[in-house]
Amino acid sequence: VEKIADRIGGNEAARHALMRGVPEMTLAWQDEVTGVWLRARPDFLPQSCIDGEDIRIVTDLKFLAGTHCSPRKFSKAMDDFGFYLAAAHYSEGIKQIFGKYPTGFVFVVVEKDEPHTVSLYYPPPEDIDRGRKQMRQAIDLFAACLKRNEWPGYADRPMEVGLPIYARMRVDESTETDLTRAIWGEPEEEAA
């Protein structure tokens, strides 16, 4: 833990992103459309959000495997793990509680394993907007489920689910290779 703290503290931008604020403050509010109660718990809420200052940048700390820390891999992780949804949800909670949306959102990404590299990424505003739209749909669906007391699963009726394309290709290729070997034997190596 000390090594990770040292790595974060050694990164000037990360250090500033985690200064002057409140860690893990719980925000709770009632959705204006559905009346459903919502909550969020940002990793770090800057004092500037609480005080209503002009610059309000929220920080979300992510500890990830190194395979998710490069810009390209983090882009995929934003989708896989819904980080853009969290940014949208936290932003909405901050607006509801403090009256203004954050002016920015930054992910401080730390590799779980040594050397514990630290990277800072921010989602473009249009991705946070996408997250807001999805959150709106999710809240509306949740409210409808509450009202009806019906909680549908992924497939309430029989549904065909097949192998993904990559698995089909792998199986088909290995089956063809195995069949060829069974009929013709191992291929002979060409003479040099």
What are these regions (language model features)?
Residues 23, 58, 105-107:
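Conserved beta-strand scaffold positions in the cores of enzyme catalytic domains, especially
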